[in-house]
Amino acid sequence: PATPAEREVEGRASREEVVDWWQERFGVAPETFENVTFWEKGSGKIWAFNADLPSPVRVEGLGITVLRTRQEHWKPTTTGVKRFGREATTNVIELEPAEAAAFAAGHDQQLDRWDGDWGYLIAAHELAGEREPIGVGLYLHGELRSRVPKGYQEELAVLK
């Protein structure tokens, strides 16, 4: 549904709520999602697709998963962060090369320097002079916990 008032299924996130969440949590401008349609498939699994296709066919999967909403704290997905995280202006932790390599490999690490919000963050590193999102981290009590799924974990070269 476009807005909460148009909701047909109790608890289902509206387009407005999804866009607002990305703006409030990560500072991603609403215009970023201008041509993006959102679908909920499964319990709170939000999919994004860069078009709007009218179809009589029941949708089973379309686009990429970007958010999980049927829990106390909404959680961005790795694919969502990789797609929209470059536009983020808040709650992005920039990792040094060795930290980025450990994070991408799925390792948790102590990082006491973060002074922003606790909770889900976008972990990023510098690649070719640009900030590149690696994935989702959960920051609690001075520890950055990698939430990179096993299928996305990789070994990054540590460049100086």
Region annotations inferred by a language model:
Residues P1-K160:
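Polybasic, low-complexity RNA-engagement segments
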